[in-house]
Amino acid sequence: MLTRKQYDLLRFIHERLKETGVPPSFDEMKEALDLRSKSGIHRLITALEERGFIRRLPNRARALEVVRLPDSAAPGLAAARSGGRGFSPSVIEGSLGRVRPVVDDEEPAAVVAVPVMGRIAAGSPISAIQTRSNTLNLPPEMLGTGEHFALEVRGDSMIEAGILDGDTVLIRKCDTADTGDIIVALVDDEEATLKRLRRKGASIALEAANPAYETRIFGPDRVRIQGRLVGLIRRY
């Protein structure tokens, strides 16, 4: 569960990435959350990273990536809205920390149907991505632009990146990615795996986020990028 400040910071970073493609500076985050020092921002970012909501990209300035969003509104928002007079459902709008009550005759919020394309290995590779099994209806702000699909994670090779066995990962379709991105890789047109991309000269390395698994290195003609991780859903 996130605190209100943690939730507000996560939403602020997410909205800024959607608008500009660049994370906000520490000064901008400090001002947005009305904090007196940057040390408070550092603590909030560390807490979000430990909980698997964001990750810091190595060797890049202002490099933050939102891995997933919480399943529900910030703690205390609904109670504050209802003034203690019973339950009053609330939804999050696009701007930071703003909520509005659900009206009975209001049209339902727009959703995007994302196909679940089977299972993906976060461990030893499995056979190539299976055919569509069902769909997830997700809010557009969770996805951003582009075409997306979802996969169920099997294995524990990405646990240090906050990705656990049984999670559902949201993937934006693409055939290129930056080094350091977590990707869906198709190896030899047979094996599908979820790993972090590293480039070593002309070769491609698929790196696990678990020391129990070795990095696998391939020639560039053996690996095809199917998409890049943009979000994660976890059920408790």
Swiss-Prot record:
It catalyses: Hydrolysis of Ala-|-Gly bond in repressor LexA. The record marks A122, G123 as: Cleavage. One of its GO terms (biological process) is negative regulation of DNA-templated transcription. It holds the Pfam family LexA_DNA_bind. CDD domains: S24_LexA-like (cd06529). The active site is at S157, K195. It is an enzyme of class 3 (hydrolase). Keywords: Autocatalytic cleavage, DNA damage, DNA repair, DNA replication, DNA-binding, Hydrolase, Repressor, SOS response, Transcription, Transcription regulation. Its EC number is 3.4.21.88. PANTHER family: LEXA REPRESSOR, LEXA REPRESSOR-RELATED. NCBIfam families: lexA (TIGR00498). Belongs to the peptidase S24 family. HAMAP family: LexA (MF_00015). This is LexA repressor. It comes from Azorhizobium caulinodans (strain ATCC 43989 / DSM 5975 / JCM 20966 / LMG 6465 / NBRC 14845 / NCIMB 13405 / ORS 571). The gene is lexA.
